[in-house]
From Swiss-Prot:
Keywords carried by this UniProt record: Ribonucleoprotein, Ribosomal protein
HAMAP family: Ribosomal_bL32 (MF_00340)
Ribosomal protein in keyword set: yes
Start-end of Basic residues biased regions: 1-16
Database matches in InterPro entries: Ribosomal_bL32, Ribosomal_bL32_bact, Ribosomal_zn-bd
Family per record: Belongs to the bacterial ribosomal protein bL32 family.
Listed GO MF terms: structural constituent of ribosome
One example of a Gene Ontology biological process annotation: translation
Xref: NCBIfam families: rpmF_bact
GO cellular component, one term: cytosolic large ribosomal subunit
Stretches for region Disordered: 1-64
Protein name from the UniProt record: Large ribosomal subunit protein bL32
Length: 64
């Protein structure tokens, strides 16, 4: 098994861990509907950048 020659310092350890932090999801608000959605994703209503891309299907609950 490999063993390092000398112990890594607290500074080196911290520098290595500096990229490990988790970020929250980037959310945007659609200008047309005001819906919140993930960046670069379509909103639940089918809008992207203010234009309707898809027409949403009727949900199962609406058919009953």
């Amino acid at each position: 098994m490999a063993v390092q020659k000398s112990r890594k310092t607290r500074s080196r350890r911290g520098m290595r861990r500096s990229h490990d932090a988790l970020r929250g999801a980037m959310l945007s608000k659609d200008p047309t509907t005001g819906e919140t959605h993930l960046r670069h994703h379509i909103s639940p209503e089918g809008y992207y950048k203010g234009r309707q891309i898809l027409t949403p299907k009727e949900s199962y609950e609406d058919e009953e």
